Amino acid sequence: MLEKTFTEKTFTLEILYHVGTYENSIHFIFDHASKTCAIVDPAWNADLFIQKITDKGYTLTDIWITHWHNDHINAVDEIAEKTGAKITVGVNETRYLRLRHAVTTVDDNDTVTLGDTKATIINTPGHTAGGICYLLDGHLIAGDSLFVYGAGHCAMPGADASVLFHSMQKFKQIADEILLHCGHDYGSQITTTMADQKSGNPFLMIDNEDDFVRYRNHIHDGSRTYPMQPVSQQALDALL
Protein backbone atom coordinates (compact mmCIF):
# COMPACT_ATOMS: atom_id res chain seq x y z
CA MET A 1 0.00 0.00 0.00
CA LEU A 2 1.05 3.55 -0.76
CA GLU A 3 0.39 6.36 1.72
CA LYS A 4 0.27 10.15 1.37
CA THR A 5 -0.21 12.86 3.99
CA PHE A 6 -1.55 16.41 3.67
CA THR A 7 -1.41 18.71 6.71
CA GLU A 8 -3.74 21.70 7.05
CA LYS A 9 -4.48 24.16 9.85
CA THR A 10 -7.09 22.09 11.72
CA PHE A 11 -6.57 18.60 10.35
CA THR A 12 -4.26 16.12 8.70
CA LEU A 13 -5.55 14.09 5.76
CA GLU A 14 -3.88 10.71 5.35
CA ILE A 15 -4.71 8.41 2.45
CA LEU A 16 -3.96 4.72 2.03
CA TYR A 17 -3.96 3.70 -1.63
CA HIS A 18 -4.44 0.31 -3.33
CA VAL A 19 -6.32 -1.31 -0.43
CA GLY A 20 -8.15 -4.60 -0.97
CA THR A 21 -9.48 -6.46 -3.97
CA TYR A 22 -10.45 -3.35 -5.94
CA GLU A 23 -7.49 -1.24 -4.78
CA ASN A 24 -9.53 1.36 -2.96
CA SER A 25 -8.23 4.61 -1.54
CA ILE A 26 -9.08 5.00 2.16
CA HIS A 27 -9.12 8.53 3.58
CA PHE A 28 -8.48 9.45 7.22
CA ILE A 29 -9.17 12.94 8.58
CA PHE A 30 -7.37 13.59 11.87
CA ASP A 31 -8.64 16.66 13.74
CA HIS A 32 -5.75 18.23 15.63
CA ALA A 33 -7.70 19.89 18.45
CA SER A 34 -10.02 17.06 19.47
CA LYS A 35 -7.72 14.14 18.63
CA THR A 36 -10.65 12.53 16.81
CA CYS A 37 -10.68 10.89 13.40
CA ALA A 38 -13.15 10.36 10.58
CA ILE A 39 -12.58 7.59 8.05
CA VAL A 40 -14.11 7.80 4.57
CA ASP A 41 -15.45 4.68 2.81
CA PRO A 42 -13.70 2.05 4.96
CA ALA A 43 -13.46 -1.32 3.23
CA TRP A 44 -11.46 -4.54 3.30
CA ASN A 45 -9.46 -4.25 6.55
CA ALA A 46 -11.23 -2.86 9.61
CA ASP A 47 -8.55 -3.90 12.11
CA LEU A 48 -5.75 -2.26 10.11
CA PHE A 49 -7.62 1.04 10.02
CA ILE A 50 -8.54 1.00 13.72
CA GLN A 51 -4.95 0.17 14.68
CA LYS A 52 -3.59 2.96 12.49
CA ILE A 53 -5.83 5.50 14.19
CA THR A 54 -5.10 4.19 17.69
CA ASP A 55 -1.34 4.17 17.09
CA LYS A 56 -1.49 7.89 16.30
CA GLY A 57 -3.24 8.60 19.60
CA TYR A 58 -6.58 9.48 18.01
CA THR A 59 -10.12 8.21 18.60
CA LEU A 60 -12.27 7.12 15.66
CA THR A 61 -15.62 8.87 16.05
CA ASP A 62 -16.98 9.13 12.51
CA ILE A 63 -17.44 7.07 9.36
CA TRP A 64 -18.21 9.18 6.29
CA ILE A 65 -19.65 7.31 3.30
CA THR A 66 -19.60 8.67 -0.26
CA HIS A 67 -21.76 5.94 -1.84
CA TRP A 68 -23.24 2.52 -1.21
CA HIS A 69 -21.12 0.19 -3.37
CA ASN A 70 -19.79 -2.75 -1.40
CA ASP A 71 -16.12 -2.04 -2.12
CA HIS A 72 -16.56 1.23 -0.22
CA ILE A 73 -18.55 0.03 2.81
CA ASN A 74 -17.71 -3.60 3.52
CA ALA A 75 -15.83 -2.70 6.73
CA VAL A 76 -18.35 -0.15 7.99
CA ASP A 77 -20.41 -2.42 10.23
CA GLU A 78 -17.35 -4.05 11.78
CA ILE A 79 -15.76 -0.68 12.54
CA ALA A 80 -19.00 0.72 13.94
CA GLU A 81 -19.40 -2.38 16.12
CA LYS A 82 -15.87 -2.08 17.52
CA THR A 83 -15.70 1.70 17.96
CA GLY A 84 -19.24 3.07 18.15
CA ALA A 85 -18.40 5.53 15.36
CA LYS A 86 -21.28 7.53 13.88
CA ILE A 87 -22.06 6.72 10.24
CA THR A 88 -22.87 9.56 7.83
CA VAL A 89 -24.35 9.04 4.35
CA GLY A 90 -26.25 11.02 1.74
CA VAL A 91 -29.99 11.19 2.29
CA ASN A 92 -30.75 9.78 -1.17
CA GLU A 93 -28.44 6.80 -0.75
CA THR A 94 -30.10 5.06 2.19
CA ARG A 95 -32.48 2.89 0.18
CA TYR A 96 -29.50 1.15 -1.42
CA LEU A 97 -27.44 0.87 1.75
CA ARG A 98 -27.41 -2.48 3.53
CA LEU A 99 -25.90 -1.89 6.96
CA ARG A 100 -26.81 -3.26 10.39
CA HIS A 101 -26.07 0.02 12.13
CA ALA A 102 -28.12 3.22 12.10
CA VAL A 103 -26.93 6.09 9.93
CA THR A 104 -27.13 9.87 10.01
CA THR A 105 -28.18 11.42 6.70
CA VAL A 106 -26.92 14.62 5.12
CA ASP A 107 -28.01 16.64 2.11
CA ASP A 108 -26.49 19.14 -0.30
CA ASN A 109 -24.65 22.04 1.40
CA ASP A 110 -24.93 20.49 4.86
CA THR A 111 -21.84 20.67 7.07
CA VAL A 112 -20.33 17.78 9.00
CA THR A 113 -18.04 18.62 11.90
CA LEU A 114 -15.09 16.79 13.39
CA GLY A 115 -13.66 18.84 16.25
CA ASP A 116 -12.48 22.08 14.66
CA THR A 117 -12.65 20.59 11.16
CA LYS A 118 -15.64 21.13 8.91
CA ALA A 119 -16.59 19.48 5.63
CA THR A 120 -19.28 20.70 3.26
CA ILE A 121 -21.49 18.10 1.63
CA ILE A 122 -21.88 18.24 -2.15
CA ASN A 123 -24.56 16.01 -3.65
CA THR A 124 -23.05 14.38 -6.75
CA PRO A 125 -25.47 11.67 -7.91
CA GLY A 126 -25.10 9.78 -11.16
CA HIS A 127 -22.63 7.03 -10.35
CA THR A 128 -25.18 6.18 -7.65
CA ALA A 129 -28.53 7.73 -6.79
CA GLY A 130 -27.31 9.58 -3.71
CA GLY A 131 -23.55 9.87 -3.93
CA ILE A 132 -21.93 12.72 -2.04
CA CYS A 133 -18.53 14.40 -1.80
CA TYR A 134 -16.83 15.98 1.21
CA LEU A 135 -15.23 19.39 0.63
CA LEU A 136 -12.67 20.30 3.28
CA ASP A 137 -10.15 23.12 3.47
CA GLY A 138 -8.12 22.62 0.30
CA HIS A 139 -9.34 19.11 -0.46
CA LEU A 140 -12.27 17.36 -2.17
CA ILE A 141 -12.96 13.73 -1.28
CA ALA A 142 -15.01 12.62 -4.27
CA GLY A 143 -15.49 8.87 -3.90
CA ASP A 144 -16.16 7.43 -7.35
CA SER A 145 -18.15 10.36 -8.75
CA LEU A 146 -15.02 11.95 -10.19
CA PHE A 147 -11.64 10.36 -10.86
CA VAL A 148 -8.36 11.89 -11.92
CA TYR A 149 -9.10 12.34 -15.65
CA GLY A 150 -12.18 10.12 -15.38
CA ALA A 151 -15.56 9.58 -13.71
CA GLY A 152 -17.61 6.76 -12.24
CA HIS A 153 -19.49 4.29 -14.42
CA CYS A 154 -23.27 4.31 -14.65
CA ALA A 155 -23.90 0.58 -14.70
CA MET A 156 -25.40 -0.33 -11.30
CA PRO A 157 -28.79 0.28 -9.65
CA GLY A 158 -29.53 3.96 -9.14
CA ALA A 159 -26.96 5.15 -11.68
CA ASP A 160 -27.89 7.61 -14.42
CA ALA A 161 -25.52 9.27 -16.89
CA SER A 162 -27.85 12.25 -17.37
CA VAL A 163 -27.81 12.87 -13.64
CA LEU A 164 -24.02 12.48 -13.61
CA PHE A 165 -23.77 15.21 -16.25
CA HIS A 166 -25.43 17.67 -13.88
CA SER A 167 -23.10 16.63 -11.07
CA MET A 168 -20.18 17.47 -13.36
CA GLN A 169 -21.49 21.02 -13.59
CA LYS A 170 -21.11 21.24 -9.81
CA PHE A 171 -17.53 20.02 -10.00
CA LYS A 172 -16.77 22.79 -12.48
CA GLN A 173 -17.69 25.35 -9.82
CA ILE A 174 -15.17 24.07 -7.27
CA ALA A 175 -12.16 26.34 -6.82
CA ASP A 176 -9.24 25.61 -9.12
CA GLU A 177 -6.71 25.15 -6.31
CA ILE A 178 -8.64 22.39 -4.51
CA LEU A 179 -6.93 18.99 -4.59
CA LEU A 180 -9.04 16.08 -5.85
CA HIS A 181 -8.94 12.79 -3.91
CA CYS A 182 -10.75 9.78 -5.40
CA GLY A 183 -12.00 6.38 -4.35
CA HIS A 184 -9.53 4.59 -6.66
CA ASP A 185 -6.17 5.49 -8.15
CA TYR A 186 -7.08 5.24 -11.82
CA GLY A 187 -5.30 8.31 -13.17
CA SER A 188 -1.81 9.11 -14.36
CA GLN A 189 -1.36 11.05 -11.11
CA ILE A 190 -2.68 10.16 -7.66
CA THR A 191 -4.11 13.64 -7.17
CA THR A 192 -4.32 16.88 -9.12
CA THR A 193 -5.88 20.28 -8.68
CA MET A 194 -9.38 20.88 -9.92
CA ALA A 195 -7.87 23.25 -12.48
CA ASP A 196 -6.03 20.31 -14.03
CA GLN A 197 -9.26 18.33 -14.14
CA LYS A 198 -11.23 21.12 -15.76
CA SER A 199 -8.72 21.29 -18.60
CA GLY A 200 -7.99 17.57 -19.04
CA ASN A 201 -10.86 15.45 -17.73
CA PRO A 202 -13.26 14.67 -20.60
CA PHE A 203 -16.24 14.45 -18.26
CA LEU A 204 -15.68 18.08 -17.27
CA MET A 205 -15.04 19.20 -20.84
CA ILE A 206 -18.32 18.09 -22.47
CA ASP A 207 -20.94 20.84 -22.29
CA ASN A 208 -23.80 19.09 -24.08
CA GLU A 209 -25.84 16.61 -22.04
CA ASP A 210 -26.64 14.26 -24.93
CA ASP A 211 -22.98 14.12 -25.94
CA PHE A 212 -22.03 13.45 -22.33
CA VAL A 213 -24.47 10.56 -21.96
CA ARG A 214 -23.32 9.02 -25.23
CA TYR A 215 -19.68 9.40 -24.23
CA ARG A 216 -20.22 7.93 -20.76
CA ASN A 217 -22.34 5.00 -21.88
CA HIS A 218 -20.94 4.12 -25.30
CA ILE A 219 -17.60 5.76 -26.09
CA HIS A 220 -15.44 6.17 -23.00
CA ASP A 221 -14.69 2.56 -22.06
CA GLY A 222 -13.59 1.62 -25.56
CA SER A 223 -11.46 4.68 -26.15
CA ARG A 224 -9.33 4.98 -23.02
CA THR A 225 -6.80 2.90 -21.12
CA TYR A 226 -5.50 2.92 -17.54
CA PRO A 227 -3.90 4.86 -16.01
CA MET A 228 -6.09 7.58 -17.46
CA GLN A 229 -4.23 10.49 -19.02
CA PRO A 230 -5.45 14.05 -19.62
CA VAL A 231 -7.42 14.50 -22.85
CA SER A 232 -7.18 17.44 -25.24
CA GLN A 233 -10.31 19.19 -26.45
CA GLN A 234 -9.36 18.33 -30.03
CA ALA A 235 -9.05 14.61 -29.28
CA LEU A 236 -12.34 14.63 -27.37
CA ASP A 237 -14.19 16.44 -30.15
CA ALA A 238 -12.97 13.83 -32.63
CA LEU A 239 -14.63 11.10 -30.56
CA LEU A 240 -17.91 12.97 -30.27
Regions found by a protein language model. Name each.
Residues I87-V91, A142-G143, C182:
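Hydrophobic residues in well-ordered beta-strands that form the structural core
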Residues M1-T5, H166-L240:
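Accessory terminal helices/loops
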Residues L2-K56, C133-G143, Y149:
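Conserved beta-strand hairpin/beta-sheet module of binuclear metal-dependent hydrolase folds
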Residues F11, N92, D110, T117, ...:
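Well-ordered beta-strand scaffold positions
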Residues I29, D41, H67, I79, ...:
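Divalent metal-coordination and catalytic microenvironments
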Residues H27-F28, N109-L135, Q173:
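Core dinuclear metal-dependent hydrolase active-site scaffold
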